[in-house]
């Protein structure tokens, strides 16, 4: 049997004990970057945590194209009590709300996990220092559908502004009065985009389509963007009618929206966040809402969301939380971290995640490696 050994194959110990052949499970494997399986052999096992029906649907469509990969889907999310379920798996796959702190990483290391596949763009919930220390690699799915998130940001802005969600309910109850449905024009108003990565750029283009003037703030301005004007953060806050957050969660951006920055905003501003909940200091936002600073607020992400997001809590009594306080305000519109949730995005997530796994498996270059 010919054996083509790929460079830096992370599964060397497992796959080159051929003289023993205690099990025909690996018999006939030929290794190369383009031909990494033969005779239906399983090369890599992945445990998917926090799996929803839509996750399975999109991954199972693509799995036949990756016959060297075996996966198991479980509903439980990963945390200290469930990390040990990864015993016997080469990799785990997790989502944005997973607990991947130091204790969990240490347990994954004890169970022999070599790779963490994040089926999302963000990884601020992963303890990268510990994964590096334990030799566990982390891959993600960058930019799987910037347009999906940007479109949802504008949908939130429009819904919060024009009260379409309330109008729908009123009409279903045969109430066609217009009381409480007054909005404002976006045309010829100023949109302030904080963060001009792919999503921020997509949002800027959408705002331009509404006839808005688009200004932006970013720590690293992109001089090639001719459809917006970069300004200082203070100028953006003080002149924008619509502010949309599209920056990553970093120590520099945590609680970027706080009492000080809110005070600099125009009265009657509309604020939208589809990026990370920690960008906004929620207590300060609530104080601003009570002071009538905001015409409307649209939130797809929020602090404390990890305990509730993606779960059906409709039959539960939630403990006192900032989420409940936000929901009590008539000018706040909230959705359940669904900005990414389109057919195109889920297809891209599944494909990129499996490609990340394949690249790791055969020792190819990993384009989406965090470290």
Predicted segments with their positions:
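Structural alpha-helical scaffold elements that stabilize or flank donor/cofactor-binding regions
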Residues: 84-85, 235-236, 261, 325-326
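An N-terminal-biased, well-structured beta-alpha scaffold segment characteristic
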Residues: 44-138, 258
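Rossmann-like dinucleotide-binding domain for NAD(H)/NADP(H)
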Residues: 268, 277-371
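Short, Lys/Arg-enriched N-terminal segments with co-localized hydrophobic residues
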Residues: 25-43
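Rossmann-like dinucleotide/phosphate-binding beta-alpha-beta segment
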Residues: 179-267
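Short glycine-/small-residue-rich Rossmann-like dinucleotide-binding loops
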Residues: 96-97, 241, 247-249, 275-276, ...
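Phosphate-binding beta-alpha-beta segment of Rossmann-like dinucleotide-binding domains, i.e.
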Residues: 134-190, 194, 202-205
């Amino acid at each position: 049997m010919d054996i083509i050994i790929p460079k830096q194959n992370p599964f060397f110990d497992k796959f080159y004990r051929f003289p023993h052949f205690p099990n025909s499970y690996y018999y006939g494997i030929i290794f190369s970057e383009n031909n990494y399986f033969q005779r239906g052999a399983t090369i890599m096992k992945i445990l998917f945590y926090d799996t929803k029906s839509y996750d399975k649907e999109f991954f199972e469509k693509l799995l036949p194209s990756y016959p060297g990969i075996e996966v198991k889907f479980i509903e439980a999310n990963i945390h200290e009590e469930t990390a040990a379920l990864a015993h016997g798996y080469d990799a785990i796959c997790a989502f944005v709300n997973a607990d991947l702190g130091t204790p969990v990483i240490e347990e994954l290391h004890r169970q022999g996990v070599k790779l963490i596949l994040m089926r999302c763009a963000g990884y601020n919930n992963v303890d990268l220092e510990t994964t590096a220390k334990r030799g566990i690699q982390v891959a993600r799915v960058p930019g799987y559908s910037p347009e999906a998130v940007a479109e949802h940001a504008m949908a939130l802005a429009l819904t919060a502004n024009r009260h379409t969600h309330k109008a729908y309910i009123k009409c279903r109850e045969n109430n066609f009065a217009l009381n409480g449905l007054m909005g404002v024009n976006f045309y010829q108003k100023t949109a302030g985009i904080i963060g001009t990565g792919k999503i921020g750029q997509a949002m800027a283009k959408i705002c331009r389509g509404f006839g808005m003037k688009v200004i932006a703030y970013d720590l690293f301005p992109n001089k090639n963007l001719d459809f917006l004007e970069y300004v200082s953060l203070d100028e953006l806050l003080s002149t924008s009618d619509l502010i949309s957050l599209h920056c990553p969660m970093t120590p520099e951006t945590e609680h970027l929206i706080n009492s000080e920055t809110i005070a600099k905003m125009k009265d009657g501003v509309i604020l939208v966040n589809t990026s990370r909940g920690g960008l906004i200091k929620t207590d300060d936002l609530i104080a601003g809402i009570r002071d009538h600073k905001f015409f409307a607020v649209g939130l797809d992400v929020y602090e404390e969301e990890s305990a509730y997001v993606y779960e059906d809590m409709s039959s539960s009594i939630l403990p006192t939380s900032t989420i409940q306080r936000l929901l009590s305000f008539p000018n706040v519109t909230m959705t359940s971290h669904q900005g990414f949730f389109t057919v195109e995005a889920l297809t891209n997530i599944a494909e990129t995640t499996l490609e990340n796994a394949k690249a790791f498996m055969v020792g190819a270059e990993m384009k989406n490696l965090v470290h």
